[in-house]
């Protein structure tokens, strides 16, 4: 007779198998926001997709909720979009489309089980895609590749496969194959079912694509497809067969092989086939490294970690939300959990399902899900919450910024608003904020990957906190954390041509003017270990 524990375990495993969680990585302008919207369209989460860069009378992108995103037509913050398709629950972790916000993307990838690598068919692999691929590789994420914009002039499909294999070291397996390219792109051939999917353009892709499905050997095929395209397709199929590669799911799940899909997100060609295959081949929620070792998602007690904080998602209520990835067990509304960093207990009374800016209170959640929790200043990025035995998940890394500037508040009457705004934007990781160790220099130092991060901080301080600010750039371009902390820095003695500051967690950070300056310090102080990446949320208390 099956025990209650066995029944609960079976239910848990069944729930896990029907969950998929993924983030999309791409270079700017590869079509990430468009693909995101089309996946939501097919998932029934929206009924009409609007192009972000289209005319003003078209709808704004669902995933772009911040005022500055709507004004500029770019994604500058990550968000979560949950929807159902077939009998799966899908958590789409939407990442910023602009390269200046790559650190937000890094944090989001820490919560993902799968990655979708989006490539422009004309451009192939681009710098930002390569950077983000390296993060996926470190985390051994399965990578599914969608070659986009096949309806425009582009490179030969075989050239793109060769580039991925040569430059990323991934085996490739085309799950489907394009029929034509550019203005002669007609659809794709599905290798698993040996069927041809021909698409019709509709409303600039704002509604689901209509398709005609034909068996490869159907004699009526020439009624639908030009002879030269049909014969070229047959040659391509023969060539793929000669290459002999088979789809190896264990290799896919280990991040060694990438399934390749061809299509056009703008016109919806190939999007549904991609979504269907991803659900079949994608990885269900998996175990994560913790202080207790790798915890399987079937571990009975609830655990999760904070990978993102966001202030003022609802301008009317000036709220602050912590994005929590559920890792193990079952989350239930009103449960009391332990906060690993502070040792306190917290009642989670209003957990929310997230869909960009929209939210709804939920009763329960399972591993792979992302929930929103009200954050009255309790949570920091990387925090672990848990029930049962004490544990802590690995911290989320903090990457080296390249631009630095003092942030000034010229209006003393706005001091409180300025302090509050800076503190809250620092907590959510909108930008790294460093502090001078000179007690007479009170102005915070903004540290960013790109100039647009500075603009966003100033824009949000003005629009959300009513504070106008000015920037004073600093002539530094590299930051390194000191291994061993202040004791190691004191032991090293005097350092030339560097600026010593401290980060949010009170740790020493050295700023260098250039690479030569950094190398000189390393040569003069060989025992001083400098790191370009610092972990966050590993038990260290932030300093105000």
UniProtKB/Swiss-Prot annotation:
**In which broad location class does this protein mainly occur, judging by the first location in its UniProt entry?**
cytoplasm
* Single annotated GO MF: GTP binding
Q: What organism is listed for this UniProt entry?
A: Microcystis aeruginosa (strain NIES-843 / IAM M-2473)
Q: Which protein family is named in the record? A: Belongs to the TRAFAC class translation factor GTPase superfamily. Classic translation factor GTPase family. PrfC subfamily.
Gene Ontology terms: cellular component: cytosol
The places in or outside the cell where this protein is found are: Cytoplasm
**tr-type G domain sequence ranges:** 17-286
Recorded hits in PROSITE patterns, A to Z, give: G_TR_1, G_TR_2
Q: Name one GO biological process term.
A: regulation of translational termination
One Pfam family name from the record? RF3_C
Q: Which UniProt keywords apply?
A: Cytoplasm, GTP-binding, Nucleotide-binding, Protein biosynthesis
The record lists GTP as bound by 26-33, 94-98, 148-151
In terms of HAMAP family, this protein maps to: Rel_fac_3 (MF_00072)
Protein name, per record: Peptide chain release factor 3
Q: What does this protein do?
A: Increases the formation of ribosomal termination complexes and stimulates activities of RF-1 and RF-2. It binds guanine nucleotides and has strong preference for UGA stop codons. It may interact directly with the ribosome. The stimulation of RF-1 and RF-2 is significantly reduced by GTP and GDP, but not by GMP.
Gene3D superfamilies, alphabetized: P-loop containing nucleotide triphosphate hydrolases, Peptide chain release factor 3, domain III, Translation factors
